[in-house]
Amino acid sequence: LLDPGDTPHENARFLVFCAAVIRAVSVNAKMLRAIVASAGNDHRLGANEAPPAIISIFLGDQLSDVFEQIARSGEATSSKESGTLTIGVDTIPAMPKHSGDRNRTSPFAFTGNKFEFRAVASNQSIASPLTLLSTIVAESLDYVATELEAAEGDFNSAVQALLKEIVTEHGTVIFNGDGYSDAWHKEAEFDRGLPNLKTTFDALPALVSEDAVELFTKYNVLTEREVESRYEVY
């Protein structure tokens, strides 16, 4: 489902699922930050080879270009070539270069056929982050399915229209640059409106927000009391 293939602009299924993840991260960025919050992780995020506390998505040049085409014209008509990698040894042929990158400054990165959530602390159980990720992606896929099932007319046109809507509304969460730079922190917070919750104290209230309680109870993941109890424990 998250394998773009050689021509991702033609892979509607991939684009729909990728867009659903983009929407999920954009809508629930505060909760994603909160679910990895701890005193130790506050010191780690943004330094020492760790991503910043600002939740953004790295897609790589190829996929970013595809979604930019969709945002501009409503559909993508081409995909950038991945290119080749040469290492300067004549006896070794050029190797195909992966279209994704290893941008270690991104907290949520696409790496070929999957997304990596890199903000989780090294000594933290992955249970809560996985529970949240599964829930927010399920909600986003629910939204996508509801929109497409209600669409009238040509189905492919409805898919393209939905992709454009998601990218236009949530594309601000996509960032392929240096997450450590001061310029990005200013751009993210002031130009893009992305949350920058630097401390656990700032982040944790997102777990008991009205949106969080509604999300977990709607999909029968946690009751309101269970949500509140986890907040108190954290």
Residue ranges and their predicted role:
Residues 2-38:
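Catalytic or ion-translocation cores adjacent to nucleophile or general acid/base/metal-coordination motifs
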Residues 24-234:
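Acidic, glycine-enriched catalytic cores built around paired aspartates
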